[in-house]
Amino acid sequence: MSHSRHRAEAPPLQREDSGTFSLGKMITAKPGKTPIQVLHEYGMKTKNIPVYECERSDVQVHVPTFTFRVTVGDITCTGEGTSKKLAKHRAAEAAINILKANASICFAVPDPLMPDPSKQPKNQLNPIGSLQELAIHHGWRLPEYTLSQEGGPAHKREYTTICRLESFMETGKGASKKQAKRNAAEKFLAKFSNISPENHISLTNVVGHSLGCTWHSLRNSPGEKINLLKRSLLSLPNTDYIQLLSEIASEQGFNITYLDIEELSANGQYQCLAELSTSPITVCHGSGISCGNAQSDAAHNALQYLKIIAERK
């Protein structure tokens, strides 16, 4: 969640060889850049370097919450997230949205919903950049990529990346991190390619057909693993909670991402967040004497939460 406190007009970016510099072109010309990086480049060109300050850090609750404030010239925005990085990311994103809304900053983005691949040389096709252009064109938040899994032997590595756009999600796999990101972006573009601009279908409506694992589907699932969870006490010793959660995820069609928190807890324990790509997204906190124990505790808490949800009628 992001908040803007002051929406003063930002000075237009200037090139040395021409007039107004297009922030939109700067974003789309450099696909894969995070909002933090884009805002920093904007600040460099306008001589207003973004300044980030941590306003709140609450790690004692079930789900840690961080609030960061970013100031760029006369613009101040805040962002919240379950990690410092995510909070800064959202604060920068909010500032970019204000700059985008400024009439003095032009945005040269394609009018069609999808770029025309036939007009682009094959060696210049970039699904990551095309998806970013699509998000900017429709005023959506920029796509977020998360490396969720890395495995395979050294000579044949396989990476799995989760791409999120608003509440939409796709998973891509590849022999490199970049290839996995491209694959996830390509899946998004393929999904949107059948939507004509005339239909004016909002992203929210599109998401409704691809929600994946919802609370409703979880409660009514005939799956063996989820029904076993309903009958489990989740207190038996030597239970592999990470494996059990993974089996339920495979059965119910959602992904799990473990995010290690850099800061230790108040009593000196490691901390971790388990993020489940359910709809809505589930985030559970865990702690322990090691990173592995923290992940196991987060998985245990996630299982307890899923058990409560699945048993409700």
UniProtKB/Swiss-Prot annotation:
The modification Phosphoserine is found at residues 18, 167, 246, 287. Residues 1-20 are annotated as: Disordered. One of its GO terms (molecular function) is double-stranded RNA binding. The keyword Cytoplasm applies. Residues 34-101, 126-194, 240-308 form the DRBM domain. PROSITE patterns: DS_RBD. Belongs to the PRKRA family. Residues 1-103, 102-195, 195-313 are annotated as: Sufficient for self-association and interaction with TARBP2. Keywords: Cytoplasm, Phosphoprotein, Repeat, RNA-binding, RNA-mediated gene silencing. Its main location: cytoplasm. It comes from Mus musculus (Mouse). It is found in: Cytoplasm, Perinuclear region; Cytoplasm. This is Interferon-inducible double-stranded RNA-dependent protein kinase activator A. The keyword Transferase does not apply. It comes from the Eukaryota. Expressed in brain, heart, kidney, liver, lung, muscle, spleen and testis. One of its GO terms (cellular component) is nucleoplasm.
